[in-house]
């Protein structure tokens, strides 16, 4: 559980991250290098009172977005690709953790937008069920069912895949192979009891993703939220998230 003062520090870290995101959405274009985006973020974070990144940033364009912990950040961003950026500023020893996936040329293709909106739908659904009393394992199973439905709508899994799946390795895990949420605070992966029910004033990330290796497309979205008795506060709620908001900010 986080004290009010801790949540204030986390909000400040998220606000600095917002400044960085707003800067790079105007900067990204075909031909830029991933590490140039990293440099722009670093400058904006430091300018706003952060000591830098809260963790090693992931700036992954094209097929590299399907590598979950890609940290080379050394490739050219190409026209037509989507770039996945998992980044966050530190402030006062507290971490923020954000992921956005944006079109290098400022405009999603229809397929990219369809996948993006499926991830967004799961993200919003996950935020809606992460409440005091739920166990993280139960929560992730519910999120898995949401993801299964979205993958069916995208034509990535069908009923046959679902009927024959191993319960220990559901069909959706081919395209969404990581957890949905983790504690965040002094550490980006903060200490917390995952076998105990979620409590009020816990702070979690919410970060579903869909990774389609055969299409060279990986999309993840992530915000940090504070859990309340009857809802949540999205610490990153003012950062562009909808596909149209991303495109508008880039253009």
Regions of interest found by a model, annotated:
Residues 1-251:
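Active-site neighborhoods and metal-handling regions in enzymes and metal-associated proteins
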């Amino acid at each position: 559980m986080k004290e009010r003062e801790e949540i204030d520090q986390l909000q400040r870290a998220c606000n600095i991250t917002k400044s960085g995101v707003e800067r790079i959405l105007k900067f990204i274009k075909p031909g830029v290098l991933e590490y140039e985006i990293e440099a722009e973020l670093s400058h904006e974070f430091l300018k706003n009172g952060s000591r830098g990144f809260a963790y090693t940033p992931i700036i992954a364009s094209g097929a590299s977005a399907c590598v979950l912990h890609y940290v080379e950040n050394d490739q050219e961003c190409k026209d037509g690709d989507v770039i996945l950026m998992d980044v966050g500023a530190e402030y006062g020893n507290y971490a923020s953790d954000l992921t956005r996936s944006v079109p290098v040329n400022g405009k999603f293709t229809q397929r990219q937008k369809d996948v993006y909106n499926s991830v967004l739908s799961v993200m919003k659904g996950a935020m809606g069920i992460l409440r005091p009393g739920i166990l993280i394992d139960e929560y992730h199973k519910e999120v898995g069912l949401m993801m299964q439905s979205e993958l069916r709508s995208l034509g990535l899994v069908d009923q046959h895949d679902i009927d024959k799946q191993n319960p220990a390795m559901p069909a959706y895990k081919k395209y969404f192979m990581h957890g949905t949420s983790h504690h965040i605070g002094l550490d980006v992966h903060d200490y917390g009891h995952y076998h105990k029910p979620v409590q009020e004033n816990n702070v979690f990330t919410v970060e579903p993703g869909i990774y389609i290796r055969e299409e060279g497309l990986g999309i993840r979205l992530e915000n940090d939220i504070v859990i309340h008795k009857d809802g949540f506060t999205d610490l990153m709620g003012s950062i562009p998230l909808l596909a149209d908001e991303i495109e508008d900010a880039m253009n």
